[in-house]
């Protein structure tokens, strides 16, 4: 018996475009997983998922018609329970054997066939049987039902079956969209499975308008994609369809010349791929007068509302041409082009109207209105929030550059949220900040302040750029700190995957600005300084918030490739200047490569354990008069030579050199532990030796907790 390839397709009405790829991958993945679990698919089986607006399909290679039979050994019960004193089967054993389908025509023979073997402290009876392998008919039926049940569908439809289906009029069918066809081919043979009231066959439907034949008959499983493309005018593969759209977009742009390029947006490309079965890219245009509107507005309305691809010139400026991905390919495309141009025109006109209307009022005149917009029922209005952000921004600016920066930061923070009350942002919330920059420039504010208004939301996502100037950095820090301190102060913390106020993202934003801009700001002072601006609205939760930020820092550093030990050694010290963290990590990595590192890290851990056992904090003071043993005298002398140099290097920020200098202490530290009893009976000696170790511990752990490097 040889394997053959399997093809399963579910033909449905138009599926949700944003979920299509996920649905296709899940459908194929669960089918293959179930068939492998049943022994029908092999380790060599290759799974290919297909997903188009009207179909989910899977091609699975190397599928058996029947799985191999399996020898199975099942534990029944202890011998003392299954057999009586004479060795005969008890009623309990006979009942269990009957349930397993054993032949009980000769109970004595049935019992004799059982295996006796130790099971823990007792002896047990085991039943050996041969389980018949699943057939493809039954196995695929189970796998198909499982695949449909496990599809990641947030909402399902209830619909009535067609009259030519099994059980016509049955209304309890639930699926993401009404299903109209089922294909199941093992090689060229139809597998007789049923699902959603449909019986499997060997024919499907092609393109709604352009299929050459209807229905499209499939000769075998392997001809699915080719036959569907030739006879049905459908590119079934999501990946191939996406690649074809990208190719046509690039080709259309190249034909226009002038260096124009379609905007790069992979999410939009995925969504459009999920909307068409045979893509056809067309070039359209709109009136140049609309280019007076900020291009972000035009690009957003074309992408979000119409799923168009705007064209940018070589300088990145929007042109008045755009690309449409059509699902039809008529000989004369002028009607399709004209229709799309007519549809987009009102959208662009609305954007122009909003832009013109918004500029009739200044941003400053809108700030007062923020007092009527509720931010949070416990934290007040957007107006109150604006005042808090401005106050925090001024404090941060004073720490960085003094009054000059503070004045600019205060003004930018005061204006930063005013565009929330504009018509454009009301229509397109994604443009908050961006429109604030345009309106600030129109009102005569400096480019620096205008940029800060736009940038104070940055970074908005992983990998996003940081604010472009110091004013923007200050306001962005203030905005994020206000959110974090306020939400923690009212106990509104993220839980699990729920983070409605994006506190994790805000924490990472604070971290990135402090680290990547290498700002000379202490994290504790920033958080502690932000809390008083809330007055009695919050409870000070600074310790919890700092722990949260350090936790996000640890996760971020591990994602960047640092080991858990490296990260833990640095972050456990809770460094106040996050800008120092990369240098500390580099120093730890360089130290770990030294031959002295393992011994010193282990010694550091040992010292820490000794000091932890003391009820009171150990005084690092050392009296030379109480140094008796040669090893402790040598260690003290070595520390006097090494530690001042290491401290000086630390103070100048040369953390790598500081740790490398301390590596010279390895030999005297080893000798100390080999030759000195720390907890001597004499109290003064014991305290002096503990003080020596405390002094050493302090010196060794300024850059990082070296004990965390011990595996």
From Swiss-Prot:
GO terms for molecular function: arginine-tRNA ligase activity; ATP binding; glycine-tRNA ligase activity. Its EC number is 6.1.1.14. It comes from the Bacteria. SUPFAM superfamilies: HD-domain/PDEase-like (SSF109604). InterPro entries: DALR_anticod-bd (IPR008909), Gly-tRNA-synth_bsu (IPR015944), Gly-tRNA-synth_heterodimer (IPR006194). One of its GO terms (cellular component) is cytosol. It is found in: Cytoplasm. One of its GO terms (biological process) is arginyl-tRNA aminoacylation. Keywords: Aminoacyl-tRNA synthetase, ATP-binding, Cytoplasm, Ligase, Nucleotide-binding, Protein biosynthesis. Pfam families: DALR_1, tRNA_synt_2f. It catalyses: tRNA(Gly) + glycine + ATP = glycyl-tRNA(Gly) + AMP + diphosphate. The keyword Transcription does not apply. Belongs to the class-II aminoacyl-tRNA synthetase family. Tetramer of two alpha and two beta subunits. This is Glycine--tRNA ligase beta subunit. It comes from Polaromonas naphthalenivorans (strain CJ2). The gene is glyS.
């Amino acid at each position: 018996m040889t394997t053959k390839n399997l093809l399963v397709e579910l033909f449905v009405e138009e599926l949700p475009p944003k979920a299509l790829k996920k649905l296709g991958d899940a459908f194929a993945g669960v089918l293959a997983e179930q068939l492998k679990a049943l022994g029908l698919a092999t380790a060599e089986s290759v799974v290919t998922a297909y997903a188009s607006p009207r179909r989910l399909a899977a091609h699975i290679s190397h599928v058996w018609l029947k799985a191999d039979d399996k020898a199975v050994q099942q534990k029944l019960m202890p011998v003392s329970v299954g057999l009586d004193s004479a060795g005969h089967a008890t009623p309990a054993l006979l009942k269990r054997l009957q349930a397993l389908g054993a032949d009980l025509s000769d109970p004595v023979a049935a019992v004799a066939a059982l295996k006796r073997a130790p099971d823990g402290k007792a002896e047990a009876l085991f039943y050996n049987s041969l389980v018949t392998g699943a057939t493809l008919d039954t196995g695929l039926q189970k796998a198909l039902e499982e695949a449909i049940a496990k599809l990641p569908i947030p909402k399902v439809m209830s619909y009535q079956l067609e009259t030519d289906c099994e059980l016509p009029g049955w209304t309890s069918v639930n699926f993401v969209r009404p299903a109209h066809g089922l294909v199941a081919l093992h090689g060229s043979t139809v597998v007789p499975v049923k699902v959603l009231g449909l019986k499997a066959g060997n024919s499907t439907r092609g393109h709604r308008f352009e299929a050459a034949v209807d229905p499209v008959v499939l000769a075998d499983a392997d001809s699915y994609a080719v036959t569907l493309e030739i006879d049905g005018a459908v590119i079934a593969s999501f990946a191939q369809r996406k690649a074809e759209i990208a190719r046509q977009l690039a080709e259309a742009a190249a034909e226009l010349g002038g260096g124009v390029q379609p905007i790069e947006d992979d999410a939009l490309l995925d969504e459009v791929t999920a909307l068409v079965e045979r893509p056809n890219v067309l070039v359209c245009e709109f009136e140049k007068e609309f280019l007076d509107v900020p291009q972000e507005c035009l690009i957003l309305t074309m992408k979000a509302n119409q799923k168009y691809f705007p064209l940018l010139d070589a300088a990145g400026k929007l042109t008045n041409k755009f690309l449409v991905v059509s699902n039809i390919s008529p000989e004369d495309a002028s009607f399709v082009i004209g229709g799309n141009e007519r549809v987009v025109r009102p959208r662009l006109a609305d954007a122009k109207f909003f832009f013109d209307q918004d500029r009739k009022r200044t941003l400053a005149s809108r700030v007062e209105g923020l007092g009527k917009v509720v931010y949070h029922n416990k934290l007040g209005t957007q107006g109150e929030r604006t005042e808090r952000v401005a106050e925090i921004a001024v404090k941060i600016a004073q720490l960085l550059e003094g009054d000059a920066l503070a004045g600019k930061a205060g003004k930018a923070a005061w204006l930063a949220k005013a565009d929330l009350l504009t018509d454009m942002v009301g229509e397109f919330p994604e443009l908050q900040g961006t429109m604030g920059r345009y309106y600030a420039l129109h009102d005569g504010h400096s480019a620096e302040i205008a940029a800060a208004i736009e940038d104070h939301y940055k970074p908005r996502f992983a990998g996003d750029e940081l604010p472009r100037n110091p004013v923007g950095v200050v306001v962005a820090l203030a905005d994020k700190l206000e959110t974090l301190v306020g939400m923690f102060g009212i106990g509104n913390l993220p839980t699990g995957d729920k983070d409605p106020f994006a506190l994790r993202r805000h924490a990472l934003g604070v971290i990135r600005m402090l680290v990547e801009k290498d700002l000379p700001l202490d994290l504790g002072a920033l958080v502690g300084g932000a809390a008083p601006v809330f007055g009695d609205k919050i409870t000070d939760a600074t310790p919890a918030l700092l722990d949260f930020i350090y936790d996000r820092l640890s996760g971020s550093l591990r994602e960047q490739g640092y080991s858990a030990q490296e990260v833990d050694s640095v972050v456990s010290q809770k460094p106040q200047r996050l800008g120092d963290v990369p240098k500390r990590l580099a120093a730890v990595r360089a130290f770990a490569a030294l031959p002295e590192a393992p011994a010193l890290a282990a010694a550091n851990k040992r010292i820490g354990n000794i000091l932890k056992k003391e009820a009171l904090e150990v005084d690092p003071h050392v009296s030379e008069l109480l140094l008796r043993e040669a090893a402790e005298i040598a260690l003290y002398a070595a520390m006097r030579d090494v530690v001042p140099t290491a401290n000086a290097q630390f103070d100048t920020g040369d953390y790598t050199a500081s740790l490398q200098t301390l590596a010279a202490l390895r030999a005297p530290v080893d000798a100390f532990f080999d030759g000195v009893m720390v907890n001597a009976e004499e109290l003064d000696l014991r305290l002096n030796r503990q003080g020596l170790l405390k002094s050493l511990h302090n010196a060794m752990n300024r850059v990082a907790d070296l004990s965390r490097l011990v595996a």
